[in-house]
Amino acid sequence: MTVLPKTLLLLGSGELGKEITIAAQRLGCHVIACDRYSGAPAMQVADQAEVLDMNNSEALTAIIRHHQPDVVIPEIEALAVNALAELENEGITVIPTARATAVTMNRDRIRDLASEELALLTPKFAYAGSAEELRHAAEPLGWPVVVKPVMSSSGKGQSVVSNPEGLRQAWQAAMAGSRGNSPRVIVEEFLHFDLEITLLTIRQEDGSTLFCEPIGHEQIGGDYQCSWQPAELSTEQLKQAQSMALSITENLGGVGLFGVEFFLCGNEVIFSELSPRPHDTGLVTLISQNLSEFELHLRAVLKLPIPTIQTADAAASRVILAKDNLSSISYKGVEKALSEIDTQILLFGKPNARPRRRMGVALAKGKSLEAVRSKADRAAASIQVIKGKGVT
């Protein structure tokens, strides 16, 4: 039996962490939000905040031991995972598990697990630890290729390379965009896919697994731009995706929501990546489902029932991006963005802006995917990120 409230310590306080915090507080929980800088989005609504380098094992261990939370919920990839493993051995609950956090923070570890251990279909790939190794690794894959740091987020350091001459620049971009200390990249074949999807997969305490309706999405440079739900898959494609998601999440273990990404190429479903936490493409569930991905994550984490997941006929999201470097920000055009029925705007509360930084998201629902995608696009286009304070 679950007794509330619980104390939750959140590692990472971005826009996804903010929604986790809000969902947790609606269940009466006490939330401690951690990040590398003060005033991060989740800190603005949390009960307590801590600023620290979460890659520093000693600092991370000290904070967790000081607060003694019931649950530690990672919201980002760049963490001192060895410290989490030690704390888990001491009895601290890490969501979904310390091992899952460690495996998924590096593209090489999750790709090896999927491709070699679980025999899931993935793009053809290789690894390289230098620009010279990258040249040798890329040639057999054919052109173009995609080069990514083994550790990064939101598309940082990713390049599509059309010929050997572009590989050195791709290596430099990958190293500049890499997180952590691994001077290594994954290079993979460029897939001419029909669709990218995220399958939100929820593991519960009793061992059962639930799936949300698949979410289609588009990226630029590996960074999410828009998403829609439900994505149109054949019965066989959905069956394949659910089977693969079940296989890999069962291997990782623990409880909570996982964002499992796939490419659809003809009749093939190809595994791409996995996040052991709510996914940015899943922001659409804030308007599309009776229980958002954040509420589903918390229910699984807190061992609460999920009787049913209801989905709207059609829903979509479109990110709101900054264009300039701004030390203080305001938003213009909110009234126009909210003038259409079944439209919502989320402004994340980030303290500053830079070109192409994700500052918010527009959400829309309705009866057809074409209509709601257009509606979300219009709402997002109405918002301007400008210098100043407040909302006008």
Swiss-Prot record:
N(1)-(5-phospho-beta-D-ribosyl)glycinamide binds at E15, L16, E75, D280, K350, R357, R358. It catalyses: N(1)-(5-phospho-beta-D-ribosyl)glycinamide + formate + ATP = N(2)-formyl-N(1)-(5-phospho-beta-D-ribosyl)glycinamide + ADP + phosphate + H(+). It is an enzyme of class 6 (ligase). This is Formate-dependent phosphoribosylglycinamide formyltransferase. It comes from Prochlorococcus marinus (strain MIT 9303). The keyword Ligase applies. Homodimer. GO terms for molecular function: ATP binding; magnesium ion binding; phosphoribosylglycinamide formyltransferase 2 activity; phosphoribosylglycinamide formyltransferase activity. Keywords: ATP-binding, Ligase, Magnesium, Metal-binding, Nucleotide-binding, Purine biosynthesis. It comes from the Bacteria. Mg(2+) binds at E261, E273. GO terms for cellular component: cytosol. The keyword ATP-binding applies. PANTHER family: FORMATE-DEPENDENT PHOSPHORIBOSYLGLYCINAMIDE FORMYLTRANSFERASE. InterPro entries: ATP-grasp, ATP-grasp_carboxylate-amine, ATP_grasp_subdomain_1, PreATP-grasp_dom_sf, PurT, PurT/PurK_preATP-grasp, PurT_C, Rudment_hybrid_motif.
